């Protein structure tokens, strides 16, 4: 499949999701969220793989194969979590961080912590909040049947990932990825 086909499919899925959100959303917050975070914990956007390895204690390294990721176990918002760090395939720059909590009951706590950092979601549905920034950065908070996941993606680096023909992330070990839930991929 060539990159134009992949781009067309991703664009179609994004539009479909956003149209679905628009039909079910609460009124959108007028103000753009505060500045997009520079990273999560000790990892900052654009860091090289070896820099993240040096800053974060990881338990799994899949940076030589898709989805080009490092995995760590740590506390986020004083809750145990699995943190997945995703890198662009060629330049190996950090462009996305997923934080997964293995307890759907912590959704309110995580949402409350994020609310202290952000002005509010652009789209809101039951168990899903989406914040967008002008540079196409995005934060998605999602409650899944067995987990809660927060996905932070840097807009400029998402673009770089696409330019480097990076694959969309299909799964985040050890739980289903947020993108699979959003796009309802089996």
Regions found by a protein language model. Name each.
Residues 54-82:
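N-terminal, post-signal-peptide region of Sec/Tat-exported proteins
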Residues 26-64, 98-186:
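Non-cytosolic coordination micro-motifs
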Residues 72-110:
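Mid-chain, structured segments of secreted extracytoplasmic proteins
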Residues 1-10:
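Bacterial N-terminal signal peptides that target proteins for export
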Residues 22-24:
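Bacterial signal peptide processing site
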Residues 69-73, 84-85, 131-133, 141:
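Short beta-strand element of the conserved SAM-dependent methyltransferase core
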Residues 18-20:
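C-terminal motif of bacterial Sec signal peptides marking the signal peptidase cleavage site
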């Amino acid at each position: 499949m060539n990159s134009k086909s992949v781009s067309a499919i991703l664009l179609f899925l994004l539009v479909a999701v956003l149209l679905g959100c628009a039909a079910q959303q609460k009124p959108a917050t007028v103000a753009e969220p505060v500045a997009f975070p520079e990273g999560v914990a000790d990892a900052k956007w654009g860091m090289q793989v070896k820099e993240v390895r040096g800053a974060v204690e990881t338990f799994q390294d899949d940076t030589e194969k898709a989805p080009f990721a490092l995995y760590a176990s740590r506390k986020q918002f004083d809750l145990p979590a699995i943190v997945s760090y995703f890198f662009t395939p060629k330049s190996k720059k950090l462009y996305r961080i997923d934080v997964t909590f293995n307890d759907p009951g912590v959704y309110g706590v995580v949402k409350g912590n994020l609310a202290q950092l952000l002005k509010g979601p652009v789209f809101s549905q039951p168990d899903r909040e989406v914040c967008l920034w002008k540079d196409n950065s995005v934060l998605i908070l999602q409650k899944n049947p067995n987990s809660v996941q927060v996905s932070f993606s840097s807009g400029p680096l998402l673009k770089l990932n696409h330019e480097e023909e990076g694959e969309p992330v299909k799964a985040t070990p050890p739980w289903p990825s947020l993108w699979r839930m959003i796009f309802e991929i089996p």
